[in-house]
């Protein structure tokens, strides 16, 4: 069993130091947001220039801008954006001054303007590819965690194996696991799956979630095939306090808090926060492998603590310098299915630290610099030393090994050590409003030192060895926009380089491990385009031929249950996406959106997790070729000022296209059969009623929410017969919530019910999932 394989990648980070130059004490900072006058939505890529100076900047993805000016004089700020009327604002400089601006749409676009930062080009790049964006409203309500939110997104499937802390896999259009890029604020999460999962990030701390399909934006770095999930955390005002606590069924408790404070004079922002998650996961489950016997889970406790601090400077030579330090500790019991496991557990402790540097106009007007360097240190291991095993009747059974062990055939007392250094450099040069180039370099050094003397003693030989892995991904991109922004195109060329140094055990002679060194280099490319026929209707198309470098776990193992696979080939893919998007702003400022996408993908040298001949061990192997094709449709909008509706559906067909059994000339018996354990038909729909001051008074808001999810039955083995019983039944679940805030969102109370009808739901190899969950959440917000 993979150690904490439910832990997915999250945000990684570092240790390093950097000296910087401070600016004159006479400098002042003007900052704020730029929004659309009609919709209130943030505007990306608005050019802001200070009159009679060379100072200029553009708004970021949240419509936020920051401008450093000298002196204490009165200046004119000029705001320009394609499709909007030019706006001029007069301000008197102070140490720190907020200036929020609303722009009015213009019938004629502005003439060509030189943009000197990468935000506008980032907007163009993201607009050209298929992407779903999940905002703050969807992050609250019935959702208790990020997986709940992602599961309602068109084309996305989240498969869990249990309750809180259980293993889960996120797939986009059928491609899942390590093929999906996982990012936090555009930073790849790399090897943190042993320590933390995206699902561990509290929804209160998230501004939005971006789900990219098919193509991963070049500025993210790293290698991914099926798409990417990017979690964008919140930008906080000068003073901010957020406290949330939720209690629910199965003895579940979740707590999170964030405190931020900014010194206006120095421009330093200090932050501290943390989360605490606890659940016994003691729900009843029906065991299909034991004649549908019902038992109560009694060894599935999960406990995780995360604490962090940060310091950010905004008045030094760099526009932004940020240092973060995070600590994580996890304890998780292992729940038995076939047998009643009573003692085995996983544990991990991890430290991550990061230094990030940002500077617009980096020694050259129009050149923007963004650099991150991170360091990760962690220890983890599975502990399974029980001298007895038990069946579900309480009968005592002897262990398979004389040294004990109940989870596997051999015991384990792992104490594995991981060291990782990650850095990412992004340089964006904007030539003019039509042309931009980007260079991205992502480097990852991973060093694993496994140790499990008890397992080695029981096996009679050493099964895992220290290993190292280096990866370097280089990307060069060109962005083009024409016809007053109606046509956008982004072309990216990437070079994937990796090397590893590990030892491989010959299954026929386990006493002589062989040292294996690997060095390989591959190229890939992608292109995405978008054309607007009208302000409301656009066509998107993209093509990619890319490579995914095997992760360190796949290539060099994990130190206790996964062996090294130095001969593993990278996965390669060729894919096409074509879609139409209709987005209409109603007279009452309500928004209607309808999007249709079709997609085709051919994945070669697919990597799969398979058992090994060595007892208790497994390794990753190349499976062959898989073809994916499908269609997805989503419609959502404001029916009236108080009612919002959404619905989406996905059909994804994954087929085995290997004509021959690997390594033989024998015909493949599963040729053109559907890939097992992957849902192929799914849909979601929901509604939200919202109204202010429904009970009288002022500063109050009430939301009633309903969500439903449908997944058609599918097989968890190849469908060789229509009567085959190895299938996961159709599931239809409903969630509901009531949310009421008062004091202008200072206090928010939420009552939520998940799986309203208490329907029996199974997933991932027929594993039973929790039944009805009832939770109550209170949140306090000071800003």
Question: What is each model feature region?
Answer:
Residues 266, 532, 540-544, 571-629, ...:
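Membrane-embedded beta-barrel scaffold of Gram-negative outer-membrane proteins
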Residues 35, 39, 49, 80-84, ...:
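Short, acidic, small-residue-rich periplasmic hinge/interaction motif at the N-terminus
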Residues 312-329, 348-509, 514-535, 542-544, ...:
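Face-selective signature of the C-terminal outer-membrane beta-barrel domain
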Residues 238, 246, 264-344:
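Periplasmic-side early beta-strands and strand-to-turn transitions of outer-membrane beta-barrels
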Residues 66-68, 187-213:
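Short acidic/polar hinge/loop motifs at secondary-structure boundaries
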Residues 100-101, 201-240:
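A beta-strand signature from Gram-negative outer-membrane beta-barrel systems
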Residues 131, 142, 147-188:
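Extracytoplasmic beta-strand/coil segments of soluble accessory domains associated
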Residues 593-602, 621-715:
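Gram-negative outer-membrane beta-barrel transporters
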